[in-house]
Amino acid sequence: METKPMTLPMVPLRGIVVFPKVVTQLDIGRTTSVQAVKAAMDKDQYLVVTAQKDESIETPTLEELGKVGTIVKINQMLRLPGGVVSILVEGVSRVNVDTILSTEPFYEATVTPLESIHEDPMEEEAYRRILQSKFAQWVEVIKPNTDEGLDHVLGSADASEWADQIAFLVPLQLKVRQSILEELSISRRLNMVVG
């Protein structure tokens, strides 16, 4: 993925933060968001998703959205009754949402990809071990006798991906998830997820 600014269709999300490397399903119902998905499908299947601060707003402004979002690749799209589309997406990279170029017929934004910052590998490893232990305990409480979720996350060697995957999986408030998405320091991000 390029590190220079780019223009992509954008979907404001209600109640969810999508992280890089996370695969999730999104049900899209807002007309402008459905149009953004169609525009992405007609081009290269990439779009930007970012969380709304207030879910009740129908047409959020730049200030009413998270300043950091995620470029996602649409892997699958299914049309549902009532004009809703369900998309299976995979997070690609964090982006700063620089400007909204248009809101009709769909949101289009200029975004700049953001790189994670490795400050102290030893500190990252320490937080990672703590997080591994806490996540294993959480999985045991939520889904006893299964290693599936644990293996998926623990299989990654990347501390940044660990923090993002676990922040997406464990129950956290939307504001906390958005703060984790906005944090570029991997050590601080791991610490935020550890709680």
Task: List PLM regions with ranges.
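N-terminal low-complexity, acidic/polar interaction/targeting segments
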Residues: 1-195
